[in-house]
Amino acid sequence: MARNKPLAKKLRLAKALKQNRRVPVWVIVKTNRRVLTHPKRRYWRRTKLKE
């Protein structure tokens, strides 16, 4: 990927990176392990972003 990216694209990629985290441990504890995964998790090789 290009080193010089447009700011809007960089912000979109940063948002996608922040969203792509696991469910926090405190949420798992609070919900008594009902919530373990979240469906919007993205693996970089399988699902590509619309850029």
Curated annotation (Swiss-Prot):
Keywords: Ribonucleoprotein, Ribosomal protein. It holds the Pfam family Ribosomal_L39. PROSITE patterns: RIBOSOMAL_L39E. It comes from the Archaea. GO terms for molecular function: structural constituent of ribosome. One of its GO terms (cellular component) is ribonucleoprotein complex. SUPFAM superfamilies: Ribosomal protein L39e. One of its GO terms (biological process) is translation. InterPro entries: Ribosomal_eL39, Ribosomal_eL39_CS, Ribosomal_eL39_dom_sf. Part of the 50S ribosomal subunit. NCBIfam families: PRK01242.1. Belongs to the eukaryotic ribosomal protein eL39 family. This is Large ribosomal subunit protein eL39. The lineage of its organism: Archaea, Methanobacteriati, Methanobacteriota, Thermococci, Thermococcales.
